[in-house]
Amino acid sequence: MTYTVYEAMPLSQMLARVQKYYPGDGYKLVEKAYLFAQEAHKDQYRKSGEPYFTHPCFVASILVELSLDPPTIAAGLLHDTVEDCEGITLDTIRQEFGEEVAMLVDGVTKLNKLDFADKEEAQAESLRKMILAMGKDIRVILIKLADRLHNMRTLKFQKEERRVAIARETLDIYAPIAHRLGVYAIKQELEDLSLRYIDPVGYENLVQKVGQKRSEREENIRMVIDELSAKLDEQHIHHTIDGRPKHFYSIYRKMVLQNKPFDQIYDLIAIRVLVDSVPDCYAVLGIVHTLWNQMPGRFKDYISVPKANMYQSLHTTVVGGRKMPFPFEVQIRTWEMHRIAEYGIAAHWRYKEGGGAANDLDSKLYWVRQILDWQSDTRDSREFLDTLKTDLFSEEVFLFTPKGDVISMPKGATPLDFAYRIHSAVGNKCVGSKINGRIMPLDTPLETGDRVEIITSASSKGPSADWVRICKTPQAQAKIRAFLKKEYREENIETGRAMVERECRRRGLNPPDVIKPEYYDSILKKYGFTALNDIYSAVGYGGMASVYVVSRMVDEQRTQIGTLKALGYSDGAIA
C-alpha cells in the first residue's frame, strides 16, 4: 500500500485517481459521499483524538489504491454513517446515493452488529456473515478489509486486552479471507500488524534481527539484481527487478512451524522479476537457473496451474554463490499477473463492471459458492469455525482428472474429497479410487500432480458415517452429512438417542433427569429445530456432538436450579 496511517488522500487527489482509472462522471459520486461523510462525522472523534472522519477517509484511500469503482469508494466513505450518526438512516443513504451504495453500506453495517457472549461463537458467526456477504457482493468484504486495515493501523489507541482480541480476530478471520481473495497488499500488512500485538516481544526481536544485517543484505540484493539484469539485457528481455525482505509474519510462522531459530531461516528475501509476456517468464527462469544453483523441490509453476485466488507466478529458490551465499527466492511474472498478485479479486472488479469478464470473475470465486453450499448444513458454530479456518489457511495441492482437467484442493484431501468435489452423486456412489493408475484406499492423502480416477457403482448404498472422518474438506463432510440426514433419519434418531443417553451415563447422570423439554428447549431455538428427535437426528448423522448436547442441557439445568434456589425454594421442592 502506498498510503500509511499518517497520510490519507486529500479529496482532490482521490478524485483525480478515480478519474484516471474510471473515466466518466463517477467521480462526482465519490465527491458527494466525501462531503456528506465529512459533515456527518464533524463533531465525532476517535480514541486517538483525531477527527472521526479521518477513518472513512483512510478506508476510501485504500479502496482507491485497489482501483475500485465509485459506488464502492462512496460506500467506504459512508460505511459508519448509518450506525454512528444521528438522523442518518439507510433510507437517507438510498435517497442521496442510490440503491447500489445503500446495499453496500447495509452489508458493512450488518457485519458490524454481531454481538455474542461466547467469543468463539461470535467468531464463528462473524465468519459465517462474511461468507454470506461475499456471496451477495464481494465489494462488501473489500470495504470491510479496508476498514479493518485502518483500524489495525491505529490499534495502539485501544486498551491492551482489546488490542490482543482484535489482533487475534484479524489473524484468524480477516487475513485468511484477504489471502483467499488474493489481496496480498492487505493480507501481509494485516498479518504483520496482528503479530505486533499478539506477540510483541517476538515481533520486536524479529524486527531487530532482520534489521541487524539490513545493509549487508541490501548490498547482496543489489549485486544479484545487477547480475541478473545484465543477463536479461543481453537477451533483450524488457524487465523490472526489485528485491524485498519477506514480511515479518511469514518469517515468524516459518520459525514456529519448522521449530527453527532466526539464524537457521535462510530465505529471508525474494527477488521479483516483472516482464511483458508469459514466454518471457519462462525465458527468465532458464537464465536464473544458469546463473545460480536451483534447490531441489523448491520450484512452483503457478502460471500453468494458478492458485484458487487467481495468483500466477513462477517461484524458484536458488543459492547465489559468493555474492549471495544463502538461499533466496526468485518470483517471475508478467505485469498483469503482478497487478492481480497485489490486488487479487479487486483487480478484476472493474472488468466485471464493464461486462467483459463477469463469468471469469464468478468462476474464480467457486470456493465461496462451495462454502455457501455447505455452511447451511453445519449446525455447530465451533465446527463451522474449525472447518472454515482449515479451508482458509490450508495449502493447496493440484490434481488431475482422467481427462487432464486441473482441480485444486486443500493439502491433505483424500480421493473421497476429490469425488465429492466433482459432484455429490459421484461421491455418494463412490466405491474405490485409482491414483496414477493404481487402486488406492479412499483415505490416501493426495499430492500435487496426482491423477485421480473415482470408481463408482450404481448399486452402492451410499456413504456411511465413517466417511465423515475419512474426508478432510468441510464441503465433502457437509455433503455426506446431508445424505445421511435425509436417507437415514429414523436410524439417526435411534443412534443419536443412544449416544446422548450414553454420554449422560458417562457423567454419572440419569438420562430422564437431564433430557427434559425445559433443558433442551434452548438447543431447539438456537438451531431452528422443532422436536427432540431433530436433536437426536443431528447427533446421529454427525452434525452435532453428544458431548455438546448434554453439556448444554446440564448447564441449563444448573441455571434453572440456581434461579429457583435464589427465589427461596428448597432442594426437595426443586426435585
Set out the residue ranges of the language-model regions.
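Internal insertion modules embedded within essential enzymes
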Residues: 5-11, 98-101, 107-269, 281-286, ...
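Short, mixed-charge amphipathic alpha-helical segments
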Residues: 17-33, 89-101
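Alpha-helical phosphate/pyrophosphate-handling elements in metalloenzyme active cores
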Residues: 32, 36, 42-76, 81, ...
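Divalent-cation-assisted or electrostatically stabilized phosphate/pyrophosphate-binding catalytic cores
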Residues: 47-58, 94, 103, 162-172
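Hydrophobic packing positions in regular secondary-structure scaffolds
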Residues: 71-72, 76, 80-83, 94, ...
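Catalytic palm subdomain of template-directed nucleic-acid polymerases
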Residues: 81-89, 216-217, 272-286
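Interfacial "coupling" helices/loops that link adjacent transmembrane helices in transporter permeases
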Residues: 546-575
